[in-house]
């Protein structure tokens, strides 16, 4: 040993890594024995010092990082901004989730990096610091949880919980944080229990696969290699690790000079020389390149990990490899127990500005993009230098390539502001998985979208659409009401309605009494009980309210006065309004007796002589069965076509028998319907008295003649009351059979000259005994007064023209002549229905063909009435209606319920609204025509942008209208902004009238009607427009039904701003985002769609935007109604999972078992198939299969090795590549004989080794078709040469039975077979003597010649075809295909 004086004294802290280096150098220099002696001394020293120091940990040693407060605050601020963006529709839910996770993760990481410097500066001798950072006990993440911030936890599935734990364990957790933290802790406990066994099983399977691989030769003579080059973006450390301990496969030249020879062992010196010389790709030998089938040679394996020399012959390298991979798993599962499920994932690092100042960079080097969080940013491709100029200092910040720059040029930044985001490099491992995320609608309404949407090809007929580009989906608010209870709804587009009269909530139809008759809505819920007044109430002015004392009918016909009343009267005349009521007391009946049912066609259009309403008069109601007859002369029953009502689904009435008659007769009879099996106690045609027993439990109510008729399954038993006459033979009464005889007519027989006072019905009855008799029955007579013309009830219009609406009262019989009427038990039959028929005189040119109806609600004091309003229209001009699917031109059919009708009541006919429950109906497009959907827009769904006073407006025709700001007290109302529901805030549709106050002269002048109706309708002269769902715009003027394009109408608002005039263009149907600037009065408060554009204001229907990115799937159709909680969009995105080893081990296992769960392995399999097809096609059969399989296998081998290494490296576990290579070689060494060509040797579907397939093909000179296949480790263990090894692994009985049937032979080459049978194990480094030296070295020249011949042929073929598949095979394709690795190398492919 050298003298003590000569020794160098190192004053330096030695931590774990330094210790490793020291030991390895000691071994290199002094050998094993000496090193162990020195290490003993080091150990003793360590224990001695530890005892003397006796480090203890107190709670005061845990120092919290001072910068934590503002970091957390900063993160919370960012989350808040993010929430706002999401609300505005700038960021969708996935981006939001992703970003909030990254915000918190970055904060947590930043704190973790601050930890060490903080301790070093404030308290370097802190025991926590000493222990954790020396590597003695505890790691950074545990200390980080104690003094930094606990951060994001992952639940037992490895999914992230997106609520971060902001406290650390020193400060203590809040209740929520504690519960979330328990999630993570539970994960730790579960992992310790379950995953340990998993790791053990993994080790067992791995060893099973490779137990027979032993080093048997020195050199297999392969000329293949795998290229490794540091240029491929591989980290230098990994490059060195890959090379050290390998053997070169080829000479390496630097220019003309050879710097390393083939089969030379690579040590650290050689690696350094390569790096200095920047040698081009270095070809090395790996277990992949070894040519021996079931073992491996020394040169391909390389250095033995135990002692730094080439591996010895007879070493069981397979078992060593299996254990090296499996063992870290067992160790690592235990480690997660301490950190307890804290989420670790790779995220982008942030670059923060060093000081305040103005930022500058070269804009040519960046280009704009959208980050994965939905932020606008700049992407830089090369290193970017950013300068931040303060007054006196200039800071330079270097931003690495592929980073996002989050600031603009010349922007002022504050100190510590995030200016850039560095993309996470390849070194940090992110487990990604594809996740579908459904976004559910949080409000109800209809769906619109702002771009074209493609149908997904597999769902051509469904409602799943794919988005081609980023766009917004809008949910336009409104309460949907699906009218599936009744076949159609009385309400039409743009009708006013009380939301409570037709209950909006799904499921509860509390105030909607529905029968199978579709017209019986209790829509008209006016309570007139306090308002019954007799006589005609006359008021000053032409307006009249007429009441006839019963409270059933109230007609209002308001006339209109205006200075140009002539024009207006023409436009607004010809409508009248009927209020309806029902009696509250009798609400339990389905239909109030005196109530009127209204009958409106589905499309709201009346033809002439249509029936408008009907009511059932109680006088014409019978409770017994019978027959109706119409008068003596039956020719009277004239059926008029237009008087019929077409009922759909009405079971009660048979409308085809409806006729207008003057009087009719009802012949009562008693009817019993008995089942066919019941025994009848009376005979047919017998006469019985009252209360006779007919059947077992049936008694007759009246006496008379019994008729029994047998129908298919039942017996009908009728009892006629009345007299029976047996006429003589000479009587000619036979002609009276089945007729009605008026009173006063006597019989022809003089003997019985009897006169009847009432009408009678004579019916001849012929019993079986040929003697007939006549039954004379009593008849109930009904007289029906002829129709009254109700047109007289309406005041004549001032400018009377002949096309006024008239109403006639007409009575209809509901049953046909002579038809039997069956009374169902305890219900009464309505014989006559009173109808109101709508009529109007034909105009001279006959143009008025139809009348339109709509509902209006008028509120008088506290009373609400529903009115129906009828409107005459000239027949429509032909339009061209453009729909998204068909463009049809021509008249719009009357019953076009599949497209919104063009109704003249498009303007909102609300008179005064209740605060909440008032709404306007919008009809929706629906695919099925039977069930029409409505949406009710109530006041809470619309808001109005107030009048822009004092501004000038130009519309497209350059007319400028100046609003007059009169000092009028009523104008001030209009300036308030508010929801649409409160009357003054509607875009001046209606205004509340106080006593005789005159508005601006552009509004109509109306007398106030002595407080009866405080509110009437005003029609303004100024036009406003409405938009329906298809984007068509209507003028609500019944005579000018012109349809404009939505783009024809843009209003520009010119703001008088301080410096410049900006002009906003607003078009109908445009969507406005929240806080978008429209007027100079400040931003718009709510997002929504412009519904009505007015000269000085807008009405906006509130809507909620949802952002959707390309590739997202939209559910539902355009314009479809969505309810709360319906699926709106589905995003597919990649999501990080937590990256601890417990997620890692299953990943390793999945890779080794080749389960195609993630996109990577699926891609691998697809790539495999693609290669196989292409190469076979290009080169032809035998070589094609060979090369195809080899290239495929080579590709997949490398990517498998990289994937497994990635998992372990991320955990800081170093496993040498060659261990993984040995296992991967076994997984990929088999090929599957395919069915393409039959060969004599192998049957299709058989698994054979690749080398065996090649050799057999060469020997037989016959093409064997096969393709590469990836087997999992379990399948590989069950597909070995030895059935004993397979049987001892799994499925013993099956394996042994098959082997016996096939007569398999086990050559006992592996370790396991010999262990099972108790023989000698054919491994061990002392085994050399048994290997025949002669076979190793004295290769016969013939063999060598054959080998070279094949290689030469191979090379020629490859060079000849290089141009053809240059795309598939790289340029430095070396001797054979294995070297196609050049382009992958050992970096992540």
UniProtKB/Swiss-Prot annotation:
> Could you confirm whether the keyword Chloroplast appears in this record?
yes
Extract the GO molecular function terms from the UniProt entry. Answer: DNA binding; DNA-directed RNA polymerase activity; zinc ion binding
Its keywords, alphabetically, are: Chloroplast, DNA-directed RNA polymerase, Metal-binding, Nucleotidyltransferase, Plastid, Transcription, Transferase, Zinc
* Annotated S-S bridges: none
PANTHER family registered for this protein in UniProt = DNA-DIRECTED RNA POLYMERASE SUBUNIT BETA
The similarity comment for this entry is: Belongs to the RNA polymerase beta' chain family. RpoC2 subfamily.
* Name of the protein described by the UniProt record: DNA-directed RNA polymerase subunit beta''
Supply the source organism for this entry. Chloranthus spicatus (Chulantree)
What lineage, starting at the top, does this entry show?
A: Eukaryota, Viridiplantae, Streptophyta, Embryophyta, Tracheophyta
């Amino acid at each position: 040993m050298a003298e003590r004086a000569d020794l160098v004294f190192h004053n330096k802290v030695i931590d774990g890594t330094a210790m490793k280096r020291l030991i390895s150098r000691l071994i290199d220099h002094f050998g094993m024995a000496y090193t162990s002696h020195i290490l003993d001394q080091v150990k003793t020293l360590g224990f001695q010092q530890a005892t003397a120091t006796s480090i203890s940990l107190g709670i005061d040693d845990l120092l919290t990082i001072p910068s934590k407060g503002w970091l957390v605050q900063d993160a919370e601020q960012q989350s808040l901004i993010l929430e706002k963006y999401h609300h505005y529709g700038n960021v969708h839910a996935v981006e939001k989730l992703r970003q909030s996770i990254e915000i918190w993760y970055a904060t947590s990481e930043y704190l973790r990096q601050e930890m060490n410097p903080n301790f070093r500066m404030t308290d370097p001798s802190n025991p926590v610091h000493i222990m954790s950072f020396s590597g003695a006990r505890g790691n950074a993440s545990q200390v980080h949880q104690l003094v930094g911030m606990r951060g994001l936890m992952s639940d037992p599935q490895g999914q992230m919980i997106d609520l971060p734990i902001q406290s650390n364990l020193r400060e203590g957790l809040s209740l929520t944080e504690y519960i979330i933290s328990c999630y993570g802790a539970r994960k730790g406990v579960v992992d310790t229990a379950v995953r340990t066994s998993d790791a053990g099983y993994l080790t067992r399977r791995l060893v099973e696969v490779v137990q027979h691989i032993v080093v048997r030769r020195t050199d297999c003579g392969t000329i293949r290699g795998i290229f490794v080059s540091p240029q491929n973006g591989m980290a230098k450390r990994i490059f060195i690790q890959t090379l050290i301990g390998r053997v070169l496969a080829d000479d390496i030249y630097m220019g003309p000079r050879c710097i390393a020879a083939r089969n030379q062992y690579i040590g650290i010196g050689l690696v350094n020389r390569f790096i200095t010389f920047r040698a081009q790709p270095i070809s090395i030998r790996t277990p992949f390149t070894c040519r021996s089938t079931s073992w491996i040679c020394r040169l391909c394996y390389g250095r033995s990990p135990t002692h730094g020399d080439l591996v010895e012959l007879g070493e069981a390298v397979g078992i060593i490899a299996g254990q090296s991979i499996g063992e870290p798993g067992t160790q690592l599962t235990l480690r997660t127990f301490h950190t307890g499920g804290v989420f670790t994932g790779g995220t982008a690092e942030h670059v923060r500005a060093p000081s305040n100042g103005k930022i500058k960079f070269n804009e040519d080097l960046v280009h704009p993009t959208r980050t994965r969080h939905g932020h606008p940013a700049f992407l830089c491709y090369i290193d970017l230098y950013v300068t931040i100029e303060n007054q006196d200092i200039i800071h330079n910040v270097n931003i690495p390539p592929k980073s996002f720059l989050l600031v603009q040029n010349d922007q002022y930044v504050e100190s510590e502001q995030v200016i850039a985001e560095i993309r996470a490099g390849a070194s940090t491992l992110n487990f990604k998985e594809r996740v579908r995320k459904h976004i559910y609608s949080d409000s109800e309404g209809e769906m619109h979208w702002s771009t074209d949407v493609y149908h997904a090809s597999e769902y051509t007929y469904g409602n799943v659409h794919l988005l081609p580009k980023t766009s917004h989906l809008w949910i336009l608010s409104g309460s949907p009401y699906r009218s599936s209870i009744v076949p159609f709804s009385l309400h039409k587009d743009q009708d006013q309605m009380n939301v409570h009269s037709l209950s909006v909530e799904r499921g509860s139809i509390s105030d909607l009494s529905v029968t199978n008759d579709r017209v019986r809505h209790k829509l008209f819920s006016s309570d007139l009980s306090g308002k019954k007044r007799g006589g005609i109430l006359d008021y000053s002015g032409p307006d009249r309210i007429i009441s006839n004392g019963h409270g059933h009918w109230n007609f209002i016909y308001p006339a209109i006065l205006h200075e140009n009343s002539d024009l207006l009267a023409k436009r607004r005349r010809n409508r009248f309004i009927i209020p309806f009521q029902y009696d509250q007391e009798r609400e339990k009946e389905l239909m109030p007796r005196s109530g009127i049912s209204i009958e409106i066609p589905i499309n709201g259009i009346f033809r002439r002589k249509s029936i408008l309403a009907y009511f059932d008069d109680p006088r014409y109601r019978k409770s017994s069965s019978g027959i109706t007859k119409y008068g003596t002369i039956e020719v009277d029953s004239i059926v008029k076509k237009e008087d019929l009502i077409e009922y759909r689904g009405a079971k009660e009435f048979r409308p085809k028998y409806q006729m207008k008659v003057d009087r009719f007769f009802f012949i009562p009879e008693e009817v019993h319907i008995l089942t066919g099996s019941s025994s009848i106690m009376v005979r047919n045609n017998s006469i019985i008295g009252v209360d006779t027993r007919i059947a077992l439990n049936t008694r007759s109510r009246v006496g008379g003649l019994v008729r029994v008729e047998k129908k298919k399954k039942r017996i009908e038993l009728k009892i006629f009351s009345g007299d029976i006459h047996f006429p003589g033979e000479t009587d000619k009464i036979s002609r009276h059979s089945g007729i009605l005889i008026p009173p006063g007519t006597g019989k022809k027989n003089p003997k019985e000259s009897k006169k009847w006072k009432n009408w009678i019905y004579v019916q001849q009855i012929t019993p079986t005994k040929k003697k007939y008799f006549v039954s004379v029955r009593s008849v109930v007579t009904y007289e029906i007064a002829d129709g009254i013309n109700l047109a007289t009830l309406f005041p004549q219009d001032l400018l009377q023209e002949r096309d006024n609406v008239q109403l006639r009262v007409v009575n209809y019989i509901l049953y046909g002549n002579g038809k039997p009427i069956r009374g169902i038990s305890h219900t009464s039959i309505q014989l006559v229905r009173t109808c109101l028929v709508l009529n109007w005189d034909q105009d001279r040119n006959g143009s008025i063909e139809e009348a339109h109806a709509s509902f209006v609600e008028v509120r008088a004091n506290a009373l609400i009435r529903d009115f129906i309003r009828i409107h005459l229209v000239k027949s429509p001009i032909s339009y061209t209606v453009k729909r998204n699917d068909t463009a049809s031109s021509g008249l719009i059919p009357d019953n076009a319920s599949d497209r919104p009708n063009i109704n003249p009541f498009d303007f909102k006919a609300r008179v005064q609204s209740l605060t909440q429950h008032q709404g306007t109906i919008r009809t929706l497009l629906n695919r099925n025509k039977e069930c029409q959907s409505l949406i009710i827009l109530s006041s809470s769904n619309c808001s109005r942008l107030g009048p822009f006073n004092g501004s000038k407006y130009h519309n497209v025709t350059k007319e400028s209208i100046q609003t007059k700001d009169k000092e009028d007290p009523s104008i001030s109302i209009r300036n308030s902004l508010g929801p649409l529901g409160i009357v003054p805030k509607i875009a001046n549709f209606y205004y509340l009238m106080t006593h005789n106050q005159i508005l601006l002269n552009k509004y109509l002048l109306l007398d106030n009607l002595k407080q009866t109706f405080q509110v009437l309708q005003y029609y303004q002269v100024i036009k406003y427009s409405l938009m329906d769902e298809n984007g068509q715009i209507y003028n609500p003027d019944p005579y000018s039904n012109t349809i404009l394009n939505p783009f024809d109408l843009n209003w520009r608002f010119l703001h008088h701003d301080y410096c410049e005039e900006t002009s906003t263009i607003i078009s109908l149907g445009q969507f406005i985002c929240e806080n978008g600037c429209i007027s100079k009065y400040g931003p718009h408060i709510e997002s929504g769609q412009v519904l009505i554009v007015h000269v000085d204001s807008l009405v906006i229907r509130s809507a909620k935007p949802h952002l959707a990115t390309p590739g997202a799937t939209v559910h539902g159709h355009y314009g479809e109604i969505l309810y709360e909680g319906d699926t709106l969009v589905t995003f597919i995105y990649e999501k990080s999972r937590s990256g601890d080893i417990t997620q890692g081990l299953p990943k390793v296992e999945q890779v080794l078992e080749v389960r195609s769960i993630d996109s990577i392995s699926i891609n691998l399999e697809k790539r495999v198939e693609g290669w196989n097809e292409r190469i076979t096609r290009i080169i032809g059969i035998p070589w094609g299969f060979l090369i195809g399989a080899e290239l495929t296998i080579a590709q997949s081998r490398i990517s498998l090795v990289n994937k497994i290494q990635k998992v372990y490296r991320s955990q800081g576990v170093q496993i040498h590549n060659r261990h993984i290579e040995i296992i991967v070689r076994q997984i990929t060494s088999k090929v599957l004989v395919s069915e393409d060509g039959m060969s004599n040797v192998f049957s299709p579907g058989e698994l054979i080794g690749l080398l065996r397939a090649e050799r057999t093909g060469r020997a037989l000179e016959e093409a064997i078709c096969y393709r590469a296949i990836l087997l999992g480790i379990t399948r590989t263990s069950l597909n070995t040469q030895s059935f004993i090894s397979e049987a001892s692994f799994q499925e013993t009985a099956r394996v042994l039975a098959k082997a016996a049937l096939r007569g398999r032979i086990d050559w006992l080459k592996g370790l396991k077979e010999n262990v099972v049978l108790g023989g000698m194990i054919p491994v061990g480094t002392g085994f050399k003597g048994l290997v025949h030296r002669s076979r190793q070295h004295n290769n016969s020249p013939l063999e060598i010649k054959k080998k070279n011949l094949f290689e030469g042929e191979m090379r020629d073929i490859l060079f000849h075809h290089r141009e053809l598949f240059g795309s598939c095979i790289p340029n430095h394709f070396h001797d054979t295909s294995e070297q196609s690795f050049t382009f992958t190398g050992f970096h992540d492919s």
